[in-house]
Amino acid sequence: MDNKLRIDYLSNHIDYKVVQHKDMYHFNTDTCLLGEFINIKKNDTVLDVGTHNGALLVYIIKKGWIATGIEINAKALEICKLTLKENNINATLIDGDFTSYNFKSKFDCIVSNPPYFTFKDKQTNKNENKNIARHENSLTIESLCKALKQNLKENGVIYLIYKANRINELEKELNNNSLYINELQYVYSKVKPNPKSVLVKASFNNNGKIMQDNKYI
């Protein structure tokens, strides 16, 4: 194996392996929280948007769901292939842009840990691979929500993790595309008073109620 590659394990799952490249974006706590948050029927079709090194795909496939991953960064997709091989699992992988790709069919579930830093939030990294994963240069909140609407089945569900202080922006864009938040889980660090991230479940179902909970890590 390339000396810039290493194998890590997803939290609480010693059999969930992820290949990571020294110079590319690594999975983090958000990835693990989202993987555990997803709850759908066995054999549902799931699309992982921005699949990167395949960490979320491992959760999805190991739980018995039929997975497709789309990734705009070809280098990251090659790492994802190695992750699948290490776990002896299979998925359909697409080298493409979620906002413009023409899928053959819609999905029961779409999941994503999208880039949620704007260029105003934080100085961008000189590493272009990390910029693609972290900053809204190729996948804005507006384009994400529009594509979610286009590719989700009528009774489908969306699972996301997003920056907590941008939840109002996310909700607005979801609503603009006839999508509605059904559940929120704010993620708190035990040493900080304000939540950093929020887990989001959304769908076309607008029942006027949002289940809300807090998670402490």
In which residue ranges do the predicted regions lie?
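Residue-level signal for inorganic ion chemistry
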Residues: 34, 113, 144, 202
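Short glycine/threonine-rich catalytic loop with a Thr-x-Gly-x-Asp
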Residues: 25-27, 52-53, 192-193
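SAM-dependent transferase fold signal centered on methyltransferase-like domains
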Residues: 33, 62-63, 78, 83-87, ...
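Flexible, glycine-/basic-rich loop-and-beta segments that form/coincide
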Residues: 191-217
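Conserved SAM/SAH cofactor-binding pocket of Class I
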Residues: 36-103, 109-123
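S-adenosyl-L-methionine
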Residues: 2-41
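Conserved Class I SAM-dependent methyltransferase catalytic core
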Residues: 17, 138-195
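Mobile active-site "lid"/loop adjacent to the S-adenosyl-L-methionine
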Residues: 114-143
